[in-house]
Amino acid sequence: MSAAPPVAVSAPSRLRQFYALTKPRVVQLIVFCALIGMVLAVPGLPSAAQWGRIAWACAGVWLVAGAAAAFNCIVEQGIDAKMKRTAWRPTARGELSNAQTLLFSALLCVAGSALLYFLVNPLTMWLTFATFVGYAVIYTLILKPLTPQNIVIGGASGAMPPVLGWAAMTNTVGPEALILFLIIFLWTPPHFWALALYRVEEYRQSGLPMLPVTHGSAFTRLQVLLYTLILFAACLMPFIYGMSSWPYLAAAVLLGAGFCGYGFALWRNYSDALARKTFRFSLIHLSALFAALLLDHYLP
């Protein structure tokens, strides 16, 4: 019996497959955090020329972040196929070949790096490329399959967007950018461990040494609580350093108290539903915190 002929894929469907490789929702948050870094680096409203630089910088960061996401899909296609939340990815479903995905990733990386180098500044390009290497190679290939601390160490790459944004506008990496980096770095572990808690069986089947798999639920929940407490303190630093004023402080305290509350509840009385709510609130926490920084920046 002869094999069935391959199913033709329309151009729009193929484009959607390539777009899905870039993990658009993740990249949107990355670009948003980079944008906050750009805007905070500029006193007052950006000029027309600065808005142009912001646009090019956002485009460059989006392209390189998308390239890293696509490369990640190649490396983790076997793992993605075993996990419900990632089984839809085109590489996991066999809709795109490794060669197609690798070429797509390379094109995005080259295009984004060129935009940043020629239309923003070389420092931003090199920092963005280092972030690509940190995520795609050091985190995805080395840390993630090796250690349950993968999220902690690899979180440095995920915390880079505001640093990239700051460098894009100032051609330097100031202490303000490092404060923003620290906030995201400390936010990352409780965010991902909350997800891993209610997806623990999927991670166990995938073979990834996530903390709930290697150290159990109780230990992971304690770590979530501890990190939310440390994060609460870190989120006060923009006010202490003079980057922001009282409106931001009020937002930071409320959001931090909410995240700590979820962490405490999760530690005391676990349920998958509560872990899912904690994960979702973590997204609200980071987005609202950076939005508060932005609004505070323009208050008289």
From Swiss-Prot:
Residues passing through the membrane, by range: 26-46, 54-74, 102-122, 123-143, 150-170, 177-197, 224-244, 246-266, 279-299
Keyword Lipoprotein: no
Tree of life domain: Bacteria
CDD domains associated with the record: PT_UbiA_Cox10 (cd13957)
Reactions this protein catalyses: heme b + (2E,6E)-farnesyl diphosphate + H2O = Fe(II)-heme o + diphosphate
Enzyme's top EC category: transferase
Topology of this chain in the membrane: Multi-pass membrane protein
One GO location term (cellular component): plasma membrane
Gene Ontology biological process terms, A to Z: heme O biosynthetic process
Compartments it resides in: Cell inner membrane
Functional pathway: Porphyrin-containing compound metabolism; heme O biosynthesis; heme O from protoheme: step 1/1
Family: Belongs to the UbiA prenyltransferase family. Protoheme IX farnesyltransferase subfamily.
UniProt protein name: Protoheme IX farnesyltransferase
Organism: Verminephrobacter eiseniae (strain EF01-2)
